[in-house]
Design a protein with these regions (language model features):
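Short, conserved sequence motifs used for protein processing/export or organelle targeting and
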Residues: 26-226
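Local sequence-structure signature of Cys/Sec-based thiol-disulfide redox active-site neighborhoods
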Residues: 1-35
Length: 226
């Protein structure tokens, strides 16, 4: 959770990016939910406020891991790693997720297909977001505003709610497929967009996810039960 008005957010983002790139590349994916604060943030969406209230976010920047554990971004790296590792080790994925996008440039539209296969019979929900890189806005950085490039910005929720769309009960080793037709907003740059598919378990936590680029992106199943 961040904001253009937040003086400590650039430093927090630098720390989080370093931690992910050094220890969790391809495992942890970052989403930036912008909220209004002492001034309005041009990248704010309604769901940012809904989620910040849900997780009782009181300080910025803050991070929520798998819609479960919260942490500040000024924590010691060992503390941050412990929170990531707990989510990975204590709550392992029991489903695989694949996502693909077929982009129609003429209509500025993408057909997104999400596939979920479960290794056990369980109930799931699917949350799908549009995320954009390369947005340039003024940012408060340590008390001084400067030009700043914002990445991983959540632009739109494509599911019915932040709780996700019901996939129902998926039987062991069976696959469920859900498709979305996404009209791209005129203010978005298609080449900078990705779709994030978060598959939630029966407790409302992220069990697994997949990410693909908006322009004909494809991310096949990666999780394999050993």
């Amino acid at each position: 959770f961040t904001g253009t008005w937040c003086a400590m957010c650039p430093a927090g983002m630098t720390r989080l990016n370093y931690l992910i790139s050094s220890s969790y590349e391809g495992i942890v994916y970052l989403m930036s939910f912008h909220v209004d604060g002492t001034s309005a943030d041009p990248m704010t969406i309604e769901q940012s406020s809904i989620l910040s209230r849900k997780f009782a976010i009181s300080g910025y920047p803050s991070c929520v891991v798998d819609m479960r554990g919260t942490m500040g971004l000024s924590e010691n790296y060992s503390v941050m790693r412990a929170i990531f590792n707990e989510s990975l080790e204590k709550y392992p994925a029991h489903c695989g997720v694949a996502i693909s996008s077929v982009y129609n440039e003429v209509d500025s539209e993408a057909k997104v297909t999400v596939k979920v296969t479960s290794e056990k019979t369980a109930d799931y929900r699917l949350v799908l977001y549009v995320v954009e890189n390369g947005l340039k806005y003024q940012q408060n950085d340590g008390g001084n505003y400067r030009d700043y490039t914002h990445n991983h910005v959540v632009r739109k929720l494509l599911s019915a709610s932040v709780e996700g769309d019901k996939l129902g009960q998926i039987a062991e080793d069976k696959e469920e497929v859900k498709e979305y037709t996404v009209a791209l907003d005129d203010t978005w740059k298609a080449e900078n967009l990705s779709f994030y598919a978060l598959v939630m378990d029966e407790n409302g936590y992220v069990n697994n996810l997949a990410v693909c680029e908006a322009i004909n992106g494809n991310a096949d199943y990666e999780y394999v039960n050993d």
